[in-house]
From Swiss-Prot:
Name of the protein in its database record: Large ribosomal subunit protein uL4
UniProt-listed GO biological process terms: translation
Annotated keywords: Ribonucleoprotein, Ribosomal protein, RNA-binding, rRNA-binding
Function summary: One of the primary rRNA binding proteins, this protein initially binds near the 5'-end of the 23S rRNA. It is important during the early stages of 50S assembly. It makes multiple contacts with different domains of the 23S rRNA in the assembled 50S subunit and ribosome. Forms part of the polypeptide exit tunnel.
Encoding gene, per UniProt annotation: rplD
Skewed-composition ranges (Gly residues): 56-71
Cysteines joined through disulfide linkages: none
Length: 215
């Protein structure tokens, strides 16, 4: 059974906690489907080409219908002309969204957590909180403290997951390129797969692994 690594306040390993048994044997195809669903939902539908009705010009017939020895043409906006309209081109009216049901979303999340645990990249800490130093009635050095936490983990990049995250903690991590901190309600399988390691508050971890099969 896969286990998450429990860290102490100094981010040193002090134990482990098992993932529920239902996390075992989940098909990886659920994660594949969720990643396709996620990427399609954030895709910017901006590709657009002009058809022959939208390009400028073409108000008159370019040459006489007969007698010139050339193929007949009615307008320079025809797709056969350089600068004419595009046939079957990109349109910004296409809907790229792919549907996925709630059960597949849950299974994808559970599979991604299981993969992180098997790779020893899933960590649990009691609390993720950055307080900084109070100077001139303002909290300062927030990012410095957050960076020290990240460096102590010795990971390439890290996803931090909190429950009821405070503003100081959110600001502290916002300037770090290789870190992302989110509330547990924003957690999804794509983010778990995108980061090489995951650090979760104990309360957030319990919130995620509780049995939701009845929902």
């Amino acid at each position: 059974m896969s286990k998450a690594i429990v860290l102490d306040s100094h981010l040193k390993e002090k134990g482990s906690v098992e993932l529920p048994k239902r996390y075992e044997g989940i098909n990886s195809h659920n994660l594949y489907l969720y990643v396709k669903h996620y990427l399609s939902s954030v895709r910017a539908n901006t590709a657009k080409s002009k058809n022959r009705a939208e390009v400028s010009g073409g108000g008159r017939k370019p040459w006489a219908q007969k007698g010139g020895g050339r193929a007949r043409a009615g307008s320079i906006t025809s797709p056969v002309f350089v600068g004419g309209g595009v046939s079957h081109g990109a349109t910004n009216k296409r809907n790229y969204n792919l549907k996925i049901n709630k059960k597949q979303k849950r299974l994808a999340l559970e599979y991604a957590l299981e993969e992180k645990a098997q790779a020893n990249k899933l960590f649990v800490v009691e609390k993720i909180a950055i307080k900084g130093v109070v100077e001139d009635n303002k909290r300062k050095h927030l990012t410095k403290e957050a960076n020290q936490m990240f460096q102590a983990l010795e990971q390439r990049d890290t996803l931090f997951v909190c429950l009821n995250m405070d503003e100081c903690t959110e600001l502290a991590f916002s300037n770090l390129k290789k870190c992302l901190i989110i509330d547990v309600n924003e957690l999804n399988a794509y983010l778990l797969a995108a980061f090489s390691s995951v650090v979760m508050e104990e309360a957030a971890f319990q919130h995620v692994v509780q049995d939701k099969t009845e929902e």
